[in-house]
Design a protein with these regions (language model features):
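Active-site nucleotide/adenylate-binding loops and adjacent lid/helix of ATP-dependent enzymes
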Residues: 1-92
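Short Asp/Glu-rich motifs
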Residues: 20, 26-28, 96, 184, ...
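Active-site/binding-pocket entry motifs
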Residues: 21-24, 55, 114-117, 129, ...
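Broad gene-expression machinery/nucleic-acid interaction feature
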Residues: 45-47, 94-96, 175, 187
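Phosphate-binding site of ATP-dependent enzymes
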Residues: 62-152, 156-159, 180, 186
Length: 226
């Protein structure tokens, strides 16, 4: 799906091509047919990402390099949810863009760049101190060798996050997870309940914007206490 598919307008955000597969459908059509369907629908071939349709902390998320490992990855992802999403694997600069506000008053906080020290940004890496480096805001050199171009790309990334946020009618706060692939922002998750722990991405974005997490949350609470 693209932003314009949701709103009828042209946008700069896109989603990787993918397949939604429910557990009942997987059982009903059989593993062999389901695997054939996935290979037919996911444009670009392997590698693909397999993940639960709902969840967090990368539980049940797999990078699958060949059809031989696809069935096992789907079964594992289905152990965390009633459905899975299989989509193109996208390489690039991984970021999280937090958004505050509602409607046209919403605004993006500085993108947080995510750099695993080794392997993927999976469950273990998220929980292990020192396994991931976070840069808030994203380093200009990660986007372009030219500083001016890097600033323009960052602005486009923030605009893409806002487009998605508004297209989904999100309100108050959310975190848009995406990858900059060198040409566009490829969105792979909209998290309307982002983590608030000390090492979480949303507090890092607040700090990069010069905001304290407590002041942001107090402001949100006060809006609904009036």
């Amino acid at each position: 799906a693209k932003y314009r598919d949701l709103t009828g307008e042209e946008g700069c955000a896109s989603w990787p091509q993918g397949v939604y597969l429910a557990r009942d459908a997987f059982k009903g059509m059989g593993a062999a047919t389901a695997l054939d369907l996935v290979q037919e629908r996911v444009i670009g071939g392997f590698p693909v990402a397999v993940k639960p349709a709902h969840g967090g902390s990368a539980l049940g998320v797999h990078k699958v390099d060949s059809v031989d490992d696809l069935g096992e990855a789907i079964l594992d992802a289905l152990s965390f949810d009633e459905a899975v999403v299989i989509e193109q694997w996208v390489e690039g600069v991984e970021m999280a863009v937090s958004v505050l506000g509602t409607g046209w008053d919403a605004y993006a906080l500085p993108p947080v760049e995510i750099v695993p020290m080794k392997g993927l940004y999976g469950t273990e890496a998220r929980m292990e101190p020192g396994a991931v480096q976070y840069f808030a805001p994203v380093r200009p050199a990660s986007l372009s060798d030219d500083e001016g171009d890097a600033q323009a790309i960052r602005a486009e990334i923030e605009r893409a996050a806002l487009e998605v946020y508004r297209a989904y009618n999100a309100r108050d706060l959310a975190r848009i997870d995406l990858i900059w692939d060198g040409a566009q922002a490829r969105v792979f998750e909209v998290n309307v309940s982002p983590g608030m722990a000390e090492r979480s991405l949303f507090p890092a974005a607040c700090a990069a914007a010069g905001l304290s997490l407590s002041s942001v949350l107090n402001e949100l609470v006060s809006q609904y206490a009036k």
